Amino acid sequence: LYTGTGTIANFVSKQARQVIGIEYVPEAIEDAKVNAEINGIKNTLFFAGDMKDMLTQDFINQYGRPDVIITDPPRAGMHQDVVDVILFAEPKRIVYVSCNPATQARDLQLLDVKYKVKAIQPVDMFPHTHHVENVVLLELRNED
């Protein structure tokens, strides 16, 4: 989710039967498709549109429930509708990459109803600034 030019989607494509990327910026999606073609990747699908409008229960029903969701939202974090569809889809794992720890914490709290945090890794991609990328691995809670 929030795939940009498809860097992560194309990178993980060798480990998946199919990878779907959604991004708001149509030009970025065109670049994602070109990047897949240049690299001979044939198991990716990319869609342009507002995440809250694109990622719906109907979308999940049409393309299948994902085993893993990798999300890298903008600073504002994920829209509540996106969180709701993720909770509906129930992937086994979520990898949440964020440049805003505050909105990431808010979204993690929303996902906490079904997911537990397994690992957290901050990455100092912008040395000598207060900015940090944070990567969180979430796993679906067992229904015991």
Where are these regions (language model features)?
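Rossmann-like S-adenosyl-L-methionine
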Residues: 1-144
